[in-house]
């Protein structure tokens, strides 16, 4: 078989060293160990890789098994590799079955075509293409690889799965922990992210898709692969294909997983005693008087007065040691020779790490999502297929109300002084006082507490998304063999409700030392209920496409062609909500391959 595709490679020689240590114990005496360095004799092995017809295979990989020592064949199918005689070599090339051989001089390796690999197809823009005929830079991953780890967002498991793809996770907040994806870096068109398509239709994000619904994900990386998308594909394209039913008996699958989420590492904070000593040393170094008296430092040291002179580790006080995450999915697939179906329902929950205390509303970050999907294919006639894709999700997230977000809460927690507050005592939020107590002791300052989110209210967001696709595929072999026509229509909508509880207040207290040595509290402010408000938002878009596809083989020659028209409009509740925006496109593609 004549193959003219080749890749320039680099031989990576690796020297192998073995150290043998011999120990000879006898009657309680042990001789000194002797280290002997043995260098295996290596030589340059020359060989040729050909196909079953004796034609040289250009660019075949030759790798010494168990090492990174490898090379590729040149334009004549010849390779040279530095290994020892008798070493095992693995020879491989796309479209052929891998072969393991023993290294010897002037060897000849015959690779046999892998019919399965030659017929394997890859998802590409607006269609599929045989892997063996592809020239663009495309990487893919199967759906089963995505479900090995329980994650809420598909983007969090893609990192390391495909070359050229980088993911960065900026937050661990439940419901907002999706990783940002970069394909071969990042282009600069409006600071855009990669284009995401699910079953051929643009989607805003992949973070709300259940991984159990996915058949495969393909990443289009270079210009030749993304050209048909124009400027929209400047940062790469992610093509997600969902599962579909196949003819046969119904298959029921149920998966469930539970995980324990814990902070990976928390910064250890100084105790009140250490804080006071270090602060006094700092003041002394600057030629100033110490602020913390010996009496206060002694109180910090012995912990005898934890309300007036507290020592609190804010990370331990306001954060839980762990929380739970769970993921469940039930799906059924099957069909007859006329109708095929895939039906899926999934649920995902992720708890928060912030303590909720005793308020009537939730103060912790939490996220819950329910996914559903139905993919239905019906053969209306022998040449006509009608398909329906109905999917969506309902998700809810809870957050404590703060102007600084979750990162601000963490920052305040670490900035808080360990003696600023003893926390909540008998249902009261107690703050330390910098007034002089009746025994003459006084805190020079109190600093901020880590309880900034306590009593500030909450925010609950609920989002309901619906996606409906209708596809009609008509074979037109009556005109010419290999010709087909497809029309697709899609409607997508989302509705968001944001419930906010704000405007309430929490009374705070400071300790007072009574004459009898007991502790009383001075009250500041009053407890008032939060006021509730609701805001809603909606977005919708529609998409349509019509295309002619041609795929035909003439002997050793295969020709494919695509001509497609598509149009999309998006409506958002912005300032100019009556003015939609969208695009209209014409796409053409022709491919040819020989053998």
How should these model regions be labeled?
Residues 1-372, 386-387:
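Short, small/polar-rich motifs associated with maturation and membrane association
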Residues 185, 242, 254, 330-336, ...:
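Residues on the lipid-exposed face of transmembrane beta-strands in outer-membrane beta-barrel proteins
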Residues 252-256, 343, 388, 470, ...:
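Membrane-embedded beta-strand positions of outer-membrane beta-barrel proteins
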Residues 263, 307-346, 350-353, 363-446, ...:
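Flexible loop and strand-edge segments within Gram-negative outer membrane beta-barrel domains
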Residues 273-310, 407-447, 499-530, 560, ...:
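Surface-exposed loop/turn segments flanking beta-strands in extracellular/periplasmic regions
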Residues 348-369, 399-401, 461-467, 476-583, ...:
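Small-side-chain secondary-structure face that scaffolds active or pore-lining regions
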Residues 451-454:
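Surface-exposed, low-complexity/disordered Ser/Thr/Gly/Pro/Asn-rich loops and linkers
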């Amino acid at each position: 078989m004549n193959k003219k595709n080749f890749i320039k490679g680099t031989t990576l020689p690796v020297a192998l060293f073995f150290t043998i240590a011999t120990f000879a114990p006898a009657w309680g005496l042990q001789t000194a160990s002797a280290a002997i360095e043995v260098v295996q004799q290596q030589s340059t092995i020359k060989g040729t890789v050909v196909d079953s017809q004796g034609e040289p295979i250009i660019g075949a990989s030759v790798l010494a098994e168990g090492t990174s020592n490898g090379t590729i064949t040149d334009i004549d199918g010849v390779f040279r590799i530095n290994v020892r005689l008798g070493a095992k070599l693995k020879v491989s090339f796309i479209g052929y079955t891998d072969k393991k051989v023993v290294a010897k001089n002037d060897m000849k390796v015959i690779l046999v075509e892998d019919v399965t690999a030659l017929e394997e197809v890859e998802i590409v823009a607006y269609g599929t293409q045989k892997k063996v005929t592809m020239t663009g830079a495309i990487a893919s991953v199967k759906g089963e690889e995505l479900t090995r780890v329980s994650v809420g967002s598909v983007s969090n498991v893609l990192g390391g799965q495909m070359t050229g793809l980088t993911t960065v996770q900026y937050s661990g907040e439940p419901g907002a922990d999706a990783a940002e994806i970069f394909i071969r870096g990042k282009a600069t068109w409006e600071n855009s992210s990669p284009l995401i398509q699910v079953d051929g239709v643009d989607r805003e994000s992949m973070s709300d898709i259940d991984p159990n619904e996915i058949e495969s994900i393909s990443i289009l990386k270079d210009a030749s692969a993304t050209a048909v998308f124009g400027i929209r594909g400047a940062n790469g394209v992610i093509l997600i294909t969902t599962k579909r039913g196949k003819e046969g008996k119904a298959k029921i699958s149920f998966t469930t997983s539970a995980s324990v989420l814990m902070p990976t590492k928390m910064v250890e904070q100084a105790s009140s005693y250490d804080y006071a000593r270090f602060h006094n040393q700092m003041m002394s170094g600057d030629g100033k008087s110490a602020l913390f008296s010996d009496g206060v430092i002694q109180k910090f040291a012995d912990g005898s007065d934890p309300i007036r002179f507290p020592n609190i580790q804010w990370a331990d006080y306001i954060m839980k040691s762990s929380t739970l995450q769970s993921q469940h999915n039930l799906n059924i697939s099957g069909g007859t020779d006329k109708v095929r179906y895939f039906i899926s329902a999934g649920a995902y929950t992720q708890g928060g790490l912030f303590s909720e205390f005793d308020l009537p509303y939730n103060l912790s970050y939490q996220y819950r999502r329910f996914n559903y999907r139905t993919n239905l294919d019906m053969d209306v006639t022998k040449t006509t297929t009608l398909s329906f894709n109905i999917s969506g999700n309902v998700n809810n997230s809870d957050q404590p109300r703060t102007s600084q977000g979750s990162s601000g809460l963490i920052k305040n927690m670490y900035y808080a002084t360990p003696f600023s507050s003893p926390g909540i005592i008998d249902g009261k939020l107690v703050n330390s006082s910098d007034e002089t107590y009746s025994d003459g002791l006084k805190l020079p300052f109190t600093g901020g507490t880590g309880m900034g989110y306590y009593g500030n209210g909450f925010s609950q967001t609920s989002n309901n998304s619906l996606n409906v696709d209708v596809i009609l595929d008509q074979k037109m072999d009556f005109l010419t063999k290999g010709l087909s026509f497809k029309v697709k229509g899609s409607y997508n909508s989302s509705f968001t409700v944001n419930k906010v509880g704000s405007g309430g207040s929490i009374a705070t207290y400071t300790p007072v030392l009574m004459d009898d040595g007991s502790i009383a509290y001075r009250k500041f402010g009053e407890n008032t209920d939060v006021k509730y408000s609701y805001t809603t938002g909606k977005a919708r878009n529609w998409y349509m496409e019509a295309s002619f596809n041609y795929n035909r083989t003439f002997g050793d020659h295969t020709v494919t062609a695509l001509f497609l028209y598509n149009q999309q409009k998006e409506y958002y509740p912005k300032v100019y909500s009556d003015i939609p925006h969208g695009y209209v496109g014409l796409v053409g593609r022709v491919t040819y391959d020989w053998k």
